[in-house]
Amino acid sequence: MQTASSLSVLTPLNEENVDRKSSWSKDTIAVQAVGSSPSSSSSHDFESKEDAEGMNKDESAPSPSTSSPSSASSRSQSKYVRKEALPPQLFHHLDSAKDKALTTFEEIQECQYASANIGKPPENEAMICDCRPHWVDGVNVACGHGSNCINRMTSIECTDEDNVCGPSCQNQRFQRHEFAKVDVFLTEKKGFGLRADANLPKDTFVYEYIGEVIPEQKFRKRMRQYDSEGIKHFYFMMLQKGEYIDATKRGSLARFCNHSCRPNCYVDKWMVGDKLRMGIFCKRDIIRGEELTFDYNVDRYGAQAQPCYCGEPCCVGYIGGKTQTEAQSKLPENVREALGIEDEEDSWENITARRQRRKKGIDETSKIIEEVQPTPLTSESATKVIGVLLQTKDDLLTRKLMERIFLTSDPSVCRSIIALRGYNIFGLMLKKFSIDIEFILRSIKTMLSWPRLTRNKIQDSNIEPVVQEFCDHENEEVKDHAKTLLKEWESLEIAYRIPRRKPGQVAPQSTNAEPSNNQSNPPLRDQEPQRGDKGDIKSAINNSTEDLSKKHPALHSSRPSDSRSRSKFGNDYQSHSKHNLFRKNSFPKRRRLSNSDTPSETTTPNNEQEQVSNQANKVDLNKIISAAMESVNQKNVLKAQKEEEERIAQQKREEKRRLAYEESLKRHAKKLHEKKTKSSQDATIDHHLTSHSPESIAFKAVLAKFFANKTARYQEKLGKAEFKLRVKKMTEIILKKHIQLVLSKKEKALPDELSDSQQRKLRVWAFRYLDTVVSRSGTATTTPTDSPSIGESPKKAA
């Protein structure tokens, strides 16, 4: 977020403007400023624009008695009273105002960058996490919440091109626009607001703050432009030093998130690919219907303060302080956590100290960082520190965070730092502070004290060439420690990791595999079911028996009712042949004669009836067993088909992941090669481009010829010797200017010839130069030496 130190150089554009918020401004402030405006005319001016700002006229601002400076001052004086936090207020009963809010700006899906180089982090190398693809129901759940993904813990999003965690992992919320369910509603005093449309757990990604990313020069220009257009309220958020997100005319719903002195959300900066992006996250569990708010960290510019209507017990009464000198700047949430600063909200001593600093005009942000007493890291704070070190460009903050790492001696915490790319961080810091002997010495000593078992992390970070440069350092202590560190690293071995199964590799199939789809099925009567399908056969037989009993009750009524024969059919089933299956059930059992039976009672049916009954039983049972075998066979075939389809689909998924992985490795290798090639070319230019280089001599001849021809009329006024001296002097000035542009990467190389625009500018400058020489009698001590900038007009050059 915006801090006072980052914009303290700005001057108020117009003291009559009601309010200016350099980091944040909302159309809701138009209503807030009505009660405290200096005159009634300004109040009417605001009210006439309520419809344009999305406000209803019947929802007017509070009366002066409720929002006057005196009442606001009383709120400010009572802010030090410790009060209990109020329960969250819910607004889900209010109607949605999203459609109306969308008419006040142009909604865009991605940030729009003013140039290709803007929005890039300090270190633009791809960070690869250690996670591996883990697929559940077709979804890659790698790098999810609680997965200890290094990228996720250090506010870096994974990308499919540069990581081995697989495509579409869970750490791609910015890229996939996985925003929370939110809605826009109309507040009582603050204009539009943003509310949760569902219960949101802590640390949920709410929304990305989207807009136009512009440099500081364009930011200043837009401040003046919006002021001339009559736009009273701007939407600027600082992305990093010298770069801002402007959501005034183009943005997302995140622009409607209001300020609160006790917010339920916070803003965090994430590295997504080669760009930095700002997101709003839940600071605590949020209930559906709650308004989503965060601390604006405002540095105000203007004559009047903006009253705060958050309604919290700790409310300071104003956004940005009562006066311009009291504009309170705060550190971003992630920076405070990285520095180990505890909440100062209710501390009287800290409030008094801040007041004194503001009265003396001291840069409060820098002073806070300087006054922080570094403490050793814990495993939890290590992730915060590494995340900020990868994003910040502030040298003071970097040194303070590195001091915390230097003080850390706990082996478990040191191992956590190493796992969180500690060697990468130290490599960057050694390059950044390469002339600070004390910093270099402490860095090398810290790495010497780290526990190390293998060489893997050291090799992956490419820190050895960086330390190797200090082996020839002029300081003997630095040289000795660097050699000792390299010697210890060389004695370590690279740990061998058991390789995972390669993408596309399929486990060997067993000999009992199910038949594939293209295999022809043998005839039903020759195919025997597997032993594992015995239960399926019994079930199919029972079902078929029940169906036939319903269709042919006469056939089944003549079947013997001996329960023992039916139970033997199921329990004694061993063979799958029809003969063995019906051997015991072909004929009904005859009842054994007893002594008391008479011949008439034991008389058997005639042979014809018995033969018909037996034949019907055979037909019936043949149908049952045929239906059962067919049912089992169909199940086996379907099962085999399903397994074969799943196996083919798995092969395709693995092949796709393998190709994506190989492609990402190729792209990563290509980027590294291009970076090395570019750095070597730049180094060649830096070391060989001087005023005596062949290209410099050639360009010098072009300049000398140009100045001699275009300024020949001054030869009579100055004399031949003096004229030649001045031509030589002008040539050297312009040559030196171009060499500086090439060395600073603003120009690729010295031009072979001068363009028409360059000739015009140089001719005007040369005439002014020689006129000045003539007017000053051509003395060497009074000769002008200012050189023109090729991109400037002749007036500016003069």
Curated annotation (Swiss-Prot):
E.C. designation(s): 2.1.1.359
S-S bridge residues: none
GO BP term, example: transcription elongation-coupled chromatin remodeling
Listed transmembrane segments: none
UniProt feature, compositional bias: Polar residues: 1-11, 507-522, 595-615, 777-790
Cross-referenced CDD domains: SET_SETD2 (cd19172)
Span of domain SET: 180-297
Keyword terms: Chromosome, Coiled coil, Methyltransferase, Nucleus, Phosphoprotein, Repressor, S-adenosyl-L-methionine, Transcription, Transcription regulation, Transferase
Amino acid composition bias (Low complexity), ranges on this chain: 61-78
Biased segments, Basic and acidic residues type: 44-60, 525-537
Subcellular location: Nucleus; Chromosome
Annotated GO CC locations: chromatin; nucleus
Biased composition (Basic residues): 576-593, 667-678
Comment on protein domains: The AWS and SET domains are necessary for transcription repression.
Similarity-based family: Belongs to the class V-like SAM-binding methyltransferase superfamily. Histone-lysine methyltransferase family. SET2 subfamily.
PANTHER family: SET DOMAIN PROTEINS
Function as written in the Swiss-Prot or TrEMBL entry: Histone methyltransferase that trimethylates histone H3 'Lys-36' forming H3K36me3. Involved in transcription elongation as well as in transcription repression.
Protein name (record): Histone-lysine N-methyltransferase, H3 lysine-36 specific
Source organism: Schizosaccharomyces pombe (strain 972 / ATCC 24843) (Fission yeast)
Lineage of the organism: Eukaryota, Fungi, Dikarya, Ascomycota, Taphrinomycotina
